[in-house]
């Protein structure tokens, strides 16, 4: 699924999805949720006006979705891709959540920021909500990012999270399509792994057979610095992090701290949700 607010950023995320999954047979849902547009209308002062404005915005949403669909089919024709348009009167987070569960989505691809978000923020408010609460992998595409095949993938890990096979299969398929190298980066001043960590490391090996795996270790204590340095030094195309309790990502996904941490991500960012569904 690719949520859209019809901004250039949202269309850029859709373009990335079409290119990164160009070898896969996909059903791509392009979804626009428009409740906020209805309630933010200055002329909406009486209940009697609600249905009129809602209908007007609904028709406009459907027109815009058709334009997006025509444009993406024109730019990226692909017989493996089938598209479905969804126009919904609801909040973005609720509509994404409902559609993820109804259609058993494999991934949500969206821009890090929408049309109206503050450019000084790493993530817009809608993207933050989706990253935090949707029980499905989310791939966030930075503003203005020009597509590069994900040949070099950074996957920081402490080898303590019990990963899910379905989400690892997603990474395996993506890496297999592009013969990617996955850099498994262990960030810890203590190099030696416990038996549990060794078992989880082996599980990753077994679950990612299509990729070339590199197991790296850094003794850098600051995780942000470690990740940022590695992205630059190894020319990384895609960053993968796992959203689980007490993880680095959980700390990062706080609106009050995300921009203080300083991880200003300029490459696509895949969040795997360590939640069962």
Tell me what each language-model feature is.
Residues 1-12, 80, 107-112, 118, ...:
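Intrinsically disordered or low-complexity boundary/linker segments at protein termini
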Residues 128, 172, 202, 228, ...:
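Active-site phosphate/pyrophosphate- and oxyanion-stabilizing loops and adjacent acidic/basic residues
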Residues 70-108, 208-239, 243-259, 263, ...:
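Structural beta-alpha unit
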Residues 49-63:
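A short acidic, glycine-rich active-site loop
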Residues 1-50, 152-217, 236-238, 264, ...:
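Small/aliphatic-rich secondary-structure junction motif
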Residues 123-126, 198-201, 253-258:
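Charged helix-capping and loop-helix junction motifs
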